[in-house]
Amino acid sequence: MKVAVAGCCHGALDKMYETLELLQRRHNVRPDLLLCCGDFQAVRNEADLRCMAVPAKYRHMQTFYRYYSGEKKAPVLTVFIGGNHEASNHLQELPYGGWVAPNIYYLGYAGVVRFRGVRIGGISGIFKSHDYRKGHFECPPYNQQTIRSAYHVRNIEVFKLKQLKHPMDIFMSHDWPQSIYHYGNKKQLLKMKSFFRQEVESNTLGSPAASELLQHLKPNYWFSAHLHVKFAAFMQHETKSKEELPKATKFLALDKCLPHRDFLQIIDIEHDPTAGDSLEYDAEWIAVLKATNSLINVTQSSWSVPENNGLHAKWDYSATEEAIKEVLEELNHNLKIPCNFTLTTTCYDPSKPQKNMEPVHTINPQTTEFCAQFGLTDINDRIQQVKEEGSVRGEYEEEEEEMDSSGSAEEPSEYNTDNSGLSSINPDEIMLDDEGGDEDLSTCSVDPSPDHPPEFSASFSDIRIMPDSMAVSSDDAMDSTNEELEKSGVNKQVEEKSLNERPLKRVGGSENGNSGIKIKRRNQAIYAAEDEDEAK
């Protein structure tokens, strides 16, 4: 089946789907599934905007609210993970995943689903060592610290994913797995993003937690975004025994949805032709959720991963065949995810703006139903209970006084440093087109009006469609990468032909003749190697 993979969407759903429509018009190719690798920005109203960790002047409603209200429907099944620029209050309603709009599914803090027999997993957020061992304690209304820590990856999600034993076809993370850049065209990467050099050379760029998952899960494909550059790599995994078959992962990171950027890729994935067209639960993942339910932590207290070190009575929470069979029996062998989307808040109305709308902590009926179905704890309900007891608020106020400018109190971590990439702690960081050169800073972006869609022929360039074997090297890929591709049976001639085609890019254009976004960061050089939360 054909799968479209997108980088950072930043709320530009109309433009994303318009691009897919163009793909069908020009090449008669219609993707069966769209995967989005974070910074999706499922913003429903003004309150959601206030829960997004971007400077206030860059909070734009974009177009998701039209899909939430039912005014529009996603033309293709869309599955996404969260990034570091999200309406955190909205996604927090669905810790185990769920529908954010008809035909648009969020994987949750971490999740695994199946579509046409293809197993798809993902983990939301970005890695920050100082929050990694904490529980999910945050809830709206957020402050300057929790609006950021809310999207930081927690070790409990990584632990759950590491209990999986069955093969993974596709996995998504927002930030890159640490060290993945050593398996692709590093020279070309540093040519495009020279300010990555220090962290690449010190091997500190990316997420160590994602790297840990990559080594454990060994998926066929791994897709990421976040660093706003297209990059491909091919990683051959080590085998632990002679009997174990060698595995390899094709990694692809994509850019953000902007003119002249490589933000979308089409690939062919082998699937089960007898499987239905519905999104399905993964029985092993549900069994792992049930097994680890007692480990839930909704406080700021550090949680240590159970290990076989004599300190834990139990350390293996993987799903037995009996547990998986039990899940199947509970569902009567019908794994189809119910289409039970419901509105949980008012939707943005351009004619009646509510600029002072405050976010509230909401219990989503989808999560309630999911937890009741499988005997799980609703994390948000637990947070509400603790809040009512007064313990969370008291602990939080004490902790708040100790917090430093990094956004969280420092605590020991499994990892020594914050290895999440290049960015800025500057509160005025510009997250739009950060590589516009010396452009006129007065230039601003004008999104095409939804009521007046642009002419596709004038607004988009040629579209690149990947061959059956996904090309994993860039235009001047390293010889070593090409050698690995040959060893893995990839048709090099087909790949080279595809690589010479123009990649899929959205070209700016509007009725008034303005070009696409060309906004440059103030003091860009100063921001090149700071904290990551605001940069991507």
UniProtKB/Swiss-Prot annotation:
| Co-factor(s) | Fe(2+); Zn(2+); Mn(2+)
Q: Report the GO molecular function annotations.
A: metal ion binding; RNA lariat debranching enzyme activity
Task: Decide whether keyword ATP-binding is in the record.
Answer: no
Give binding positions for a divalent metal cation 1.
C8, H10, H228
Stretch forming the signal peptide: none
User: Subcellular location, in the record's words?
Assistant: Nucleus
Query: What EC number(s) does this enzyme carry?
Result: 3.1.4.-
Protein name as annotated:
Lariat debranching enzyme
Q: Which organism is it from?
A: Gallus gallus
Q: According to the entry, what is the taxonomic lineage of the organism? A: Eukaryota, Metazoa, Chordata, Craniata, Vertebrata
Gene behind the chain: DBR1
